[in-house]
């Protein structure tokens, strides 16, 4: 595997920092701490460049808050916009293309152009086009993935990929500033967590010969025509991940496709159709009813309904949409409201 060097000057390049500044500011321009930095762009770029090249950057203390997502409580970490978030973005703008070169094709999280949409396309494609090798499904996830990452192993993996001492020192300072593992919520954490399982992904496909495999961060789905081989692969995965400090949750499932759907990414995949996960369908139904009871459609409600429409249009939910959504909310009207508000924000810099 090629090792990459001479990267710190790319990370500290004024154009990289400028792009990082504006990327980190998306959705936050109304905050005083962010607008102040945008209004003094050149000064901000020079300060970030100095911190990167001098090696004087020290991560600030983080703040944590609890997010309730799909019946789970997650501890989300946030850092100051300046300098931390800008520096995280500067680093990843340069390292992303390197990570992508060796990233497994169906590792869906974090990467623009992949995500849930690609998972929605590829799983039905496998089920319909390769019925012999999709008879059985092994579904499992990793317990407390981010917090369980062994940072010593992570830094060793980074040393095998990069040889720029300043970049390795910078990454090490960021990684060592949080414990245990990697903090959920930081831009660097997403990419480093995916990188941590890169070797595992290729092991699943190339060494353990699982015909079809897809991963969305810590959620894994494998398909095969041989139940015994999936059981054997699961044992190999369990041993491999334990050596990396990771534990497969005890609620893993191995079942025959057709006896039940594959519940993954918010969808329920059958051989010949796709529906929404029941809890998600109920959430959409309740939101649509709530919107329908209001006198007017607000920006936030419109944005929510457009997001839900994105789920519905990729499933066989025609009847559900016409019964529960269409009578309460016009998607066309919602799109108009969001477009108008976004144009207004772009003009005002908000």
Where do the PLM segments sit?
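Amphipathic alpha-helical blocks
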Residues: 37-61
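Active-site-proximal segment of RNA-dependent polymerases
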Residues: 3-8, 92-150
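Right-hand nucleic-acid polymerase module
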Residues: 80, 85, 89, 174-177, ...
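A common structural junction motif
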Residues: 238-246
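Non-catalytic, polymerase-adjacent accessory regions of viral genome-replication enzymes
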Residues: 1-46, 349-350
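Conserved polymerase palm-domain catalytic core
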Residues: 51, 121-217, 221-236, 255-256, ...
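Short, conserved non-catalytic motifs in the polymerase core
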Residues: 27-35, 60-86, 102-114, 173-194
């Amino acid at each position: 595997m090629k090792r990459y060097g001479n990267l710190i000057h790319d990370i500290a390049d004024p154009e990289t920092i400028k792009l990082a500044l504006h990327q980190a500011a998306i959705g936050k321009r109304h905050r005083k701490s962010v607008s102040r930095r945008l209004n003094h762009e050149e000064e901000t770029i020079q300060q970030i460049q100095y911190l990167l090249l001098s090696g004087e950057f020290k991560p600030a203390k983080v703040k944590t808050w609890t997010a309730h997502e799909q019946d789970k409580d997650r501890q989300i970490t946030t850092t100051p916009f300046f300098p931390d978030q800008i520096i995280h973005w500067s680093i990843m703008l340069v390292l992303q293309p390197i990570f992508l070169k060796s990233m497994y094709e169906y590792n869906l999280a974090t990467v623009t152009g992949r995500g849930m949409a690609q998972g929605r396309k590829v799983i039905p494609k496998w089920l319909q086009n390769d019925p012999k090798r999709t008879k059985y499904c092994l579904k499992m996830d990793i317990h407390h993935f981010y917090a369980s990452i062994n940072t010593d192993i992570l830094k060793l993996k980074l040393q095998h990929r990069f040889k720029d001492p300043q970049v390795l020192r910078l990454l090490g300072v960021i990684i060592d500033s949080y414990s245990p593992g990697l903090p959920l919520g930081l831009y660097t954490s997403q990419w480093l967590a995916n990188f941590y399982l890169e070797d595992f992904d290729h092991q699943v496909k190339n060494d353990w010969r699982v015909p079809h495999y897809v991963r969305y961060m810590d959620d894994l789905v494998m398909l095969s025509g041989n139940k015994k081989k999936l059981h054997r692969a699961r044992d190999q995965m369990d041993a491999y991940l334990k050596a990396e400090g990771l534990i497969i949750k005890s609620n893993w499932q191995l079942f025959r496709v057709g006896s039940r759907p594959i519940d993954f990414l918010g969808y329920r995949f059958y051989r010949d159709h796709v529906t929404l996960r029941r809890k998600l369908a109920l959430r959409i139904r309740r939101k649509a009813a709530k919107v329908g009871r209001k006198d007017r459609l607000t920006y936030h409600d419109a944005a929510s309904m457009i997001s839900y429409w994105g789920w519905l249009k990729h499933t066989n939910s025609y009847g559900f949409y016409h019964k529960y959504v269409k009578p309460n909310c016009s998607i066309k009207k919602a799109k108009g409201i969001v477009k108008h508000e976004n144009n207004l924000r772009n003009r005002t810099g908000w």
